[in-house]
């Protein structure tokens, strides 16, 4: 009697684009030898909407609602980078109060993004309970956003030279209460997850990246800091008013999925420290730049003349981008979010190149999953933290 036939050839499997662990419309073509991954080819572009080309025939204010659709879980950062470029090109000053409000909103957005990374990451590796806990805290962040901006997501809050509105009455006290509560919630996560033996079995030593590799691949954010390189643009570039606060760059040296988890968890507590200091030290004054500029320096036109150019939340349609090249960047939750902007002395950018952290961090995935088990793909991909709106643009 013949024994059961065994399969000798390799198997090619499509994972995604609608697999729940793909976090969007990512498709992986996997070559498997039983449970072992031999090769992995990511297929991108299912969510491509031409965001860079759209920017070339919109003014900055017209384009602001589009940018919140890149990384739609951390929209404050895409708005920040969109106004930072024209501000630097036009040498527009941001009032101190507006800068503090921006920092508060950016760090709240970082917390919300890390929370919605943590829940699905835990669900991917078999722990469903934290998925419900993170929504409890994330809802409080969105309540704060809604009170300040009118929107839970897609806030459209940043403006050239400031922000769209001042903080409402009572908002600061409400946010301080949230900070006190959230520190206990993070301690609860650590107690529930960090020492869990099943969790450690799934993430420890999985997806290791060395410090040399992260630099060669151009990775950034928690991916970079989890491999022993304490590089954070908030410390390096000192944009907005981050250098006025007392906080530490969070990093680990192991470079595995556990290290990336620990970095993000620690970053949430650091964000709370920054928010608390900003709320307690927020200065008075205007929340927007109320400057008015004139084209024609030789004569003094009427205030309602076309020669006037208004800065602030309602910039004139005649607001021009200087004929220069500029690269601006911020430390987004997923890494370095940058824009290469070329002005052409017109209302529209001549070129608007986006440097998305998720797209670049994703490039190392095929190398990480080779010779790993099929089940480890969810762990490794989850630890990278991608949003396909930003990857495909």
Swiss-Prot record:
Look up keyword Thylakoid and say if it applies. Answer: yes
Main location (coarse class): plastid
The record's comment on protein family reads: Belongs to the complex I 49 kDa subunit family.
Q: Under what name is this protein listed? A: NAD(P)H-quinone oxidoreductase subunit H, chloroplastic
EC?
A: 7.1.1.-
Which cysteine-cysteine pairs are annotated as disulfide bonds in the entry?
none
Question: To which species is this protein native?
Answer: Cucumis sativus (Cucumber)
Q: Which gene encodes it?
A: ndhH
Kindly give the HAMAP family that the UniProt entry links to this protein: NDH1_NuoD (MF_01358)
At the top of the EC hierarchy, this enzyme's class is translocase
Keyword entries, A-Z: Chloroplast, Membrane, NAD, NADP, Plastid, Plastoquinone, Quinone, Thylakoid, Translocase, Transport
Q: Which InterPro entries match?
A: NADH_Q_OxRdtase_suD, NADH_UbQ_OxRdtase_49kDa_CS, NDH1_su_D/H, NiFe-Hase_large
Membrane topology according to the record: Peripheral membrane protein
Q: Which GO terms describe its biological process?
A: photosynthesis, light reaction
What does the entry list under GO cellular component? chloroplast thylakoid membrane
């Amino acid at each position: 009697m013949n024994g059961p036939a065994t399969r000798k050839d390799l198997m090619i499997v499509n994972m995604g684009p609608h697999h729940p662990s793909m976090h969007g419309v990512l498709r992986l073509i996997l070559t498997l030898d039983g449970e072992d991954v031999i090769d992995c080819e990511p297929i991108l572009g299912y969510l491509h909407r031409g965001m860079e080309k759209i920017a070339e025939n919109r003014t900055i204010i017209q384009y602001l609602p589009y940018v919140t659709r890149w990384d739609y879980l951390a929209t404050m950062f895409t708005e920040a980078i969109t106004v930072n470029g024209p501000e630097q090109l036009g040498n527009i000053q941001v009032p101190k109060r507006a800068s503090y409000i921006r920092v508060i909103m950016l760090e709240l957005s970082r917390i919300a993004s890390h929370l919605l990374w943590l829940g699905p990451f835990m669900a991917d590796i078999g722990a469903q309970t934290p998925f419900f806990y993170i929504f409890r805290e994330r809802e409080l962040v969105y309540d704060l956003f809604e009170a300040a901006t009118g929107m839970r997501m897609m806030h459209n809050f940043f403006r050239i030279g400031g922000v769209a509105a001042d903080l409402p009455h009572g908002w600061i006290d409400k946010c301080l209460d949230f900070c006190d509560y959230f520190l206990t919630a993070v301690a609860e996560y650590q107690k529930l997850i960090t020492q869990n033996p099943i969790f450690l079995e799934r993430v420890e030593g999985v997806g290791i990246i060395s410090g040399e590799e992260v630099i060669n691949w151009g990775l950034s954010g928690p991916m970079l800091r989890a491999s022993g390189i304490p590089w954070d643009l908030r410390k390096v570039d000192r944009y907005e008013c981050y250098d006025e606060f007392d906080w530490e760059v969070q990093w680990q040296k192991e470079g595995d999925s556990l290290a990336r988890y620990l970095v993000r968890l620690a970053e949430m507590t650091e964000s709370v420290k920054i928010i608390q200091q900003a709320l307690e030290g927020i200065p008075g004054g205007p929340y927007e730049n109320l400057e008015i500029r004139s084209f024609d320096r030789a004569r003094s036109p009427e205030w309602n003349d076309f020669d006037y150019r208004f800065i602030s939340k309602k910039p004139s349609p005649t607001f021009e981008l200087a004929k220069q090249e500029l690269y601006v960047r911020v430390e987004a939750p997923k890494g370095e979010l940058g824009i290469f902007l070329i002005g052409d002395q017109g209302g529209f950018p001549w070129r608007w190149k986006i440097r998305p952290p998720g797209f670049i961090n994703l490039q190392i995935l095929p190398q990480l999953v080779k010779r790993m088990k099929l089940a480890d793909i969810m762990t490794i991909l989850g630890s990278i933290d991608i949003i396909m709106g930003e990857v495909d643009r």
